[in-house]
From Swiss-Prot:
Belongs to the AIR synthase family. The lineage of its organism: Archaea, Methanobacteriati, Methanobacteriota, Stenosarchaea group, Methanomicrobia. Keywords: ATP-binding, Cytoplasm, Ligase, Nucleotide-binding, Purine biosynthesis. Its EC number is 6.3.3.1. GO terms for molecular function: ATP binding; phosphoribosylamine-glycine ligase activity; phosphoribosylformylglycinamidine cyclo-ligase activity. This is Phosphoribosylformylglycinamidine cyclo-ligase. Transmembrane segments: none annotated. One of its GO terms (biological process) is 'de novo' IMP biosynthetic process. HAMAP family: AIRS (MF_00741). PANTHER family: TRIFUNCTIONAL PURINE BIOSYNTHETIC PROTEIN ADENOSINE-3, TRIFUNCTIONAL PURINE BIOSYNTHETIC PROTEIN ADENOSINE-3-RELATED. It is found in: Cytoplasm. It comes from Methanosarcina mazei (strain ATCC BAA-159 / DSM 3647 / Goe1 / Go1 / JCM 11833 / OCM 88) (Methanosarcina frisia).
Length: 333
């Protein structure tokens, strides 16, 4: 175990500074279109919503982040396309929208044999799971800017205006259903790489907790696409949705000002326990950085909770309270 107690900021990512940068950028975006295409919400939720008559169009944009560096190290690129689509689609699902179309942006230092084919395989698989089309994209070779490659995309979805879920219907006493993640997903990888580097492990080493796969294999496990949430929306009275990504549970503040009591959270996968031990990362920092086994949350009345859990393979993990975010006895702040 590392004698250091690493944080996300130690690895070079300061969430508070990042939030300041985002706020500064948003403050400059003052022009607002009127009529068809007018924004229905402010910037800052999981997806942007646009007026389209009876419907709302929903848009998201996101990328895979520094997980691509591990893909390069392993020379295995067939999963990061799934990650790219998942990060966008899950944000659409978090406001209740159905994904319909996607465009990707691939920037790279140089072209490598088999690289584009594997990227395409992942994008196709993600699109099939999401039941949407990839309608275009951009590929740029930028050797003076990019070292390795970067993969991002933009996703379009739609829903009826009356079906928009922003969290305004969340009430104290509502139940929280947690849906398992597949592992680290696509956030926190700057800290992950720092931990691996300082621990003396290699991505090619067998996992200490499962010798049948390498550490790199486990870290490249693709982000789960929670498309079954659309089935929950048809069958249940849903009050709120949350995609657990960067900043971990802290991002729940964008859903509601009420509190979250996770009295029975999902068990984090072994990869999280390994990272916590090797990096000397405390539990608070882990929950402020990673999904910790819970990749998506559904907030709804108790009467529908078991049905939602059955549809998604999740379970009841907590309830809505007056204030704060708590995982058992741990206060997340």
């Amino acid at each position: 175990m590392s004698e250091k107690h690493l944080t996300y900021a130690d690895s070079g990512v300061d969430i508070k500074e990042e939030e300041k940068t985002v706020k500064t950028l948003i403050d400059k975006l003052s022009y607002v279109r009127k009529g068809i295409g007018a924004p229905l919400t402010g910037i800052g939720h999981y997806a942007g919503l646009l007026d389209f008559g009876e419907y709302a169009l929903a848009m998201t944009t996101d990328g895979v982040g520094s997980k691509v560096l591990i893909a390069n190290e392993m020379q295995r690129w067939n999963t990061v396309g799934i990650d790219c689509i998942a990060m966008n689609v899950n944000d659409l699902l978090a406001i209740g929208a159905e994904p319909v179309a996607f465009v990707d942006y691939l920037a790279l230092e140089k072209h490598e044999e088999g690289f584009a084919e594997q990227i395409g395989e992942g994008l196709l698989k993600g699109a099939e799971i999401s039941r949407m089309s990839i309608v275009g994209g951009e590929t740029a070779t930028l050797p003076d800017i990019i070292k390795g490659f970067d993969l991002a995309g933009t996703c379009l979805g739609y829903l009826k205006k009356e079906d928009i879920i922003e969290g305004g219907r969340v009430r104290v006493g509502d139940v929280i259903v947690g849906i398992p993640s597949t592992g680290v997903h696509s956030n926190g990888y700057t800290l992950v790489r720092k931990i691996i580097q300082e621990s003396g492990y290699s991505y090619h080493d067998p996992c200490p907790y499962d010798s049948s796969k390498t550490i790199g294999d486990d870290l490249l496990e693709p982000t789960r696409i929670y498309i079954e949430v659309l089935d929950v929306l048809k069958a249940c009275e849903v009050h709120g949705l949350a995609h657990i990504t960067g900043s971990g549970l802290l991002k729940l503040r964008r859903v509601t000002k009420l509190g979250f009591d996770f009295y029975d959270p999902l068990e984090p996968q072994e990869i999280f326990k390994f990272l916590r031990k090797e990096g000397g990362v405390d539990d608070l920092e882990m929950y402020r950085t990673f999904n910790m086994g819970m990749g998506f949350l559904i907030i709804l009345p108790e009467k529908d909770a078991e049905k939602a859990a059955e549809i998604t393979g999740g379970k009841i993990v907590g309830k809505i309270v007056e204030s704060g975010i708590r995982v058992k006895d741990l206060v997340i702040e």
